[in-house]
Regions:
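Alpha-helical scaffold elements adjacent to nucleotide-binding pockets in ATP/GTP-utilizing enzyme cores
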Residues: 91, 128, 153, 157, ...
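Conserved Switch II/interswitch segment of TRAFAC-class P-loop GTPases
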Residues: 156-174, 185, 189-198
């Protein structure tokens, strides 16, 4: 156990890949190793790259890695992919996405399947980020699966969220307002060489101007890029750096760390508590009667849940 943790702290990528696989499969051994690694985490700058399908996130990310490496920063990537309906594994392999970086020891790329988890992330994204953090990567990028407005979960997992759009989206920019526009720290208009790019910038700027906030709050920049040839990538990395500096100077960097850890802790408590509760209920007649009444619609799900919680509270 200690040997595996030591290998990961030394940056062993094979050991890290094995651990992430154990965590994806919810193996107790993996959790024990992660417990040993946890005191060595909390140092990485964690970025989220999100946006609707087809905006070029993966191509943009490949150039971002190059620019971060030119600045002598080690980069870890968690690329969340759709799940195979047969194997449950990621449909897109990391070598297909960012092939040229696979031989760079300063880069570690891990594709993870959503496995039915909503919100644009894999259920074990947070665990994978902790592993990369413990390995000493300076920057960790989470690329979401690309399901559009439902990807707001990424904002709870990172320090800085970049939302990518492109010309020709039309009404989709309006649809983003209730979701992605609310969580973005940086906005990227990719394929900016296409007609309509300036119109998208104007739409985004208009919507961002409608966001309320104090004069001292961060004003999200809008960066135009052409990911296929790397245009605008330097400006985007500069924007990431500027936002990090803003977070550190205002104390919000530590605040976001605390919030991330609290949400992770809360998720684990909810999962463990639910498992423990239902494991102990199966043989209770009152519980079986409650489920029967729910199935036959003699009681609604809300009332059934309230009844169950009240019963648990009485026993605590």
């Amino acid at each position: 156990m200690k040997g595996e943790a030591k290998k990961i702290l030394q940056g062993n990528q094979l050991a890290a890949a094995r651990l992430i696989r154990l965590l994806e499969d919810a193996e107790p051994k993996g959790i024990q190793i992660l417990k040993a690694l946890y005191p060595h985490t909390g140092n990485a700058f964690i970025l989220g790259l999100t946006g609707p399908p087809g905006v070029g996130k993966s191509t943009l990310l490949a150039h971002l890695i190059t620019e971060f490496r030119q600045r002598d920063l080690k980069v870890g990537v968690v690329a969340v992919d759709p799940s195979s309906p047969i194997s449950g594994g990621a449909l897109l392999g990391d070598r297909l996405r960012m092939r040229k970086h696979t031989e760079d020891e300063g880069v570690f790329i891990r594709s993870m399947a959503t496995r039915g988890h909503l919100g644009g992330l894999s259920k074990t994204t947070k665990e994978a980020v902790l592993v990369l953090d413990a390995m000493g990567y300076d920057v960790i990028v989470i690329e979401t699966v690309g399901v559009g407005q439902d990807e707001v979960e990424v904002a709870e997992s990172v320090h800085t969220t970049a939302v990518v759009s492109l010309p020709g989206m039309g009404d989709e920019i309006q649809a983003m307002k209730a979701g992605l526009l609310e969580i973005g720290d940086i906005f990227v208009v990719n394929k900016a060489d296409k007609p309509g790019a300036d119109d998208v910038v104007d739409q985004l700027r208009l919507m961002l101007d409608m966001r309320t906030g104090s004069d001292n709050e961060w004003k999200p920049p809008i960066i135009k890029t052409v990911a296929i040839d790397g245009q605008g990538v330097i400006e985007l990395v500069d924007a990431f750096s500027a936002h990090r500096q803003y977070l550190v100077e205002t104390g919000k960097f530590d605040e976001r760390n605390v919030e991330r850890e609290y949400q992770f802790f809360r998720r684990l408590v909810m999962e463990m508590a639910a498992d423990k509760i239902f494991d102990n209920l199966d043989d209770l007649p009152a519980y079986n009667d409650l489920i029967t009444n729910l199935i036959t619609r003699k009681v609604d799900p809300y009332t059934a849940a309230e009844t169950l919680v009240k019963g648990i509270q009485c026993k605590i």
